[in-house]
Amino acid sequence: MDLSNRNIGYGITGSFCTFAKTRKEIQRLTEMGAHVIPIFSYQTQNCDTRFGTAKEFMEEVCDITGNPGIRTLQEAEPIGPKGYLDVMVIAPCTGNSAAKLANAITDTPVLMAAKAHMRNGKPLVIAISTNDALGASFKNIGMLMNTKHIYFVPFAQDNYEKKPNS
């Protein structure tokens, strides 16, 4: 698929165990010609985990995209008035971020970017990543599924035998 001249906002929230996959998808999009603009949640910017440091992850993503990324509410807000994204992706999207998005809470750069982008009637693609909270998050996921211009990457419960209530 040729994504030349396509501007993709790529929101990254704090599902740290999926960051290696996230990097690969961002790399793939850039190889297909897309101009990817990373948008980092505050947790992504500040939490060092067993999966790596925030600084290293952000540097890798910025190196792949050639873009310094969006890191503040003030940097995210102009996405709406300027309308420069063709599509926005939130991957990974935590249950917490999905709940906030479903309830119009815009207190992180990713959520502000999503709200600003949605006002232009362009697609928002969500790759949910809630680990054990999929069932508890489904009320909010359902609200988002019923929202025009929001699309979901197919998802499933990660381990239904060992975690039947997740």
Whereabouts are the PLM-identified features?
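A cross-family phosphate/adenosyl-ligand binding-site feature
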Residues: 1-124, 129-166
